[in-house]
Amino acid sequence: KNLDYKKEPDHQKWCEAVELLASQRTMGEKTSEKYSRIFYYNEPDDASNLDSERYASNSLFDIYYPVELDAQTSYPVIVSVHGGGWFYGDKELYSYYCCHLASKGFAVVNFNYRLAPQNKYPAAIEDVAYLIRYIHENAGVLHLDMEKFYMLGDSAGAQLTANYCIIAGNAAYRSKLDFFTYDRLPKAVCLNCGAYEMDKREDNISDWYMKKEDGSYAVSEEQRKLFLSQLEYLTKDFPPAYLMYSVNDDLRFQTIYLDERMEKLGIRHVIRSFGEEHPDSGHVFHINLKNPEGIQCNEEECAWFHQYE
């Protein structure tokens, strides 16, 4: 059915987060120039190395470089996977956040992926894989040092980031999937306010992402499990991870589940909680560049990446 997501209680927190992101646009172009130089990259004329059916017209990305752009230098690269409940959001909403990260010495890739409900699972995770393959194959012209490749995501973007890494790090399981995957693992990741065990939620928020209009599932049971219970597929090959949640966020327990699973497998990681003394630090608070805790979190995450250079 057609839903007005802003009126659906289950999606209210997503909408509040999205409105917070949209407010960043008011910061203006001067702020953007202060943080970094923007390189806008569109789909090239010669797209012979792309699957034109998969690389849709909205599959565009921006790269944000440090202000001191040196054409002879390749930069450590962060791929940022935006949130929005798998149904909302785009790269424009994350532009100032990505500029901020670029100011810390990274080239930051900010991209669109196909959204639900028009595009069912695994469309979004396919697009993550296509994007990473593309920047890897074109790293030279894009001034990206893929030996220093990192990923981060928030909310649904954290789920997609974890999902990508689980698939990329498990060749045996990857061979069983019937959608596009890629095997390039980042050296480290940051997962912010994510959802990782959807089968532990009491609502059916994932149905509109997984089901077709007739009520049947769009993918096989095995592939549904990869989305709904992805921590079952986690292995020790998962990259070092910085995990973050807010105590004021209903999704906080999802990060605790992930922490417990990583601890059991011996995956190198840290977990950080925020918001104990700041009730305004809620879901994806770190995107708000006016929030001191958000700035602190972003500083810690950039330091987490830099230690793996």
Pin down the residues of each PLM region:
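Alpha/beta-hydrolase superfamily serine-hydrolase fold, recognizing
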Residues: K1-E309
